[in-house]
Amino acid sequence: MVQEELSLFRITTGYFFLLWYIIILVAAYSGFFEILFNFRNRPILHTKQQANHQNDPESDDEEIYEGVTIIRPIKGIDPELTSCLESSFCQNYPRSKLQILFCVDDPNDPSIPIIQKLIAKYPTVDAQILTSESYNSQTKTSDDHYGPNPKVNNLAKGFVHAKYDILWVMDSNVWASSNILKNSVISLNGNLNMSRKMGQSRPVKLVHHVPLALSINNTTRSDDFIGGQDLEITAMTPVPSSESLNSQLVKRKSSPKSNNSLNVHPGFTYSKFSKKLGAELDEMFLHTSHSKFYVSLNNLAVAPCVNGKSNIYRRSDLDQSVRLIPHKDSPFFKDPKVKQDAGYYTSLGVGHAIKFFARYIGEDNMIGIALWENTQGRTGLTGDVVVQPYSGSENNAVKDYIQRRVRWLRVRKYMVLLATLIEPTTESIICGIYGTYAISTVFFGTWFNKYWFVMHMLIWMLTDYVQYHTLINHTLDVKNITYLPNWLNESIPPKQRNCLQWGYIWILRELLALPIWIIAMIGHEIDWRGRPFRIKKDLTAEEM
């Protein structure tokens, strides 16, 4: 009786959506369990040489580890800029093998005094500021202009001046714990992904780290300097961790408890709440939906999935990947002008290949594709995260969150169209709707079993809750690190929210996912740092 009521269309669509439902759940939960088991604590990787020579670790480090150049492009002052930049100086890595280049376009950029203080504070580290040539303060342009992407234009001088082949390109607004560089070099040279050995058919050529954002208590520019001064007093008094004789933990002044969390207090106003809600939505997105699929897709390795917040690769590999573009057929680099420019920039010498990517807004994705296609490489994770602090001062209202998501979805629409088109099916509500339809049709002979949908949403929400707090606790973990800034402590807003407050932000994030995607799909203009762009058919960007 039930089977007679089901049309061929219902049966076909039911099985189709059931298959897709299973695929999405497998992808989601493979990422979830990877995070649950391997992101619980900060990882510490060791080479075979270290394991055999633990009595003299510093001497071994000098011999084992290659030199690394850290390149940090900077424009203006972001929240907690001092501590984010200082994390580069505090890497648990031989200082004789470290170079830090701060790339600044404007010689009068307000960030320069902060950088100068850090360089003076760490005189044994090879660090310098590189500014663009012939910068015009009226037009805000310089001779270092190779395309519409201002980040790549700024980075280019760092690639040319780097004295080491291994490069760590890291945005100025993210903080990294002190073992990330060591873990990454071991992973890059050891062909490791999540500490697991990969096959030689597609070795690890780019190491990246899961990007997170944290909604923190309001700070001012002076607070940023104060944080650095506090650390200057205490950073030289490390204490050994209970977990490792080779690890150190910086003592620090405890931060005062904030009154700006979501807890309602006498000074609470809607404007304060709404101004910070965008930061909390970003935090929720990156700690839940984005991170689980980011980790899952990286492990699946069917295509590069790279966020450019923190990437480590060899300059020689990037040069080689661009050098081969004119000689290979690729749907991403097929335009004759693109091939011509690839040949031109690589002919200029070592390090100039990065200039080729200034034509793309999503340079991180295109670098990943070039390394994937032309060096037969893949990406690898270390089990580390990098954290971008968001204050509640400005540019963090709901509309700002929506604009950020729309902007990058539009970029991805042109870079990876298929993945962008199916993205809504990975969100909890849409996934629950077609999944419930499939389960109801195939197993219950009904249109929509509401009990299954409710169960689906509750399990998904519980999964995200566990994953969210696993990553939060990872970020706050004080074991085996040498530097933890004042804004990373138990009084941060994520640790102060109760379940209802967390659930409110989670529900709002899930409800906004589909409208944001629709807005991104029907529009073409991309607003980036106040400048409008459009993406052309060859994936390059054009300033409007």
From Swiss-Prot:
GO molecular function term, any single one: ceramide glucosyltransferase activity
EC number assigned by the record: 2.4.1.80
Location of the motif D2: 171
Bilayer topology term: Multi-pass membrane protein
Major place of residence: Golgi
NADP keyword on record: no
GO terms classed as biological process: filamentous growth; glucosylceramide biosynthetic process
InterPro entries reported for this sequence: Ceramide_glucosylTrfase, Nucleotide-diphossugar_trans
Residue interval(s) of motif (Q/R)XXRW: 404-408
Residues exposed to the Lumenal side: 1-15, 449-451, 523-544
EC class name: transferase
Protein's UniProt name: Ceramide glucosyltransferase
Organism: Candida albicans (strain SC5314 / ATCC MYA-2876) (Yeast)
Protein's gene: HSX11
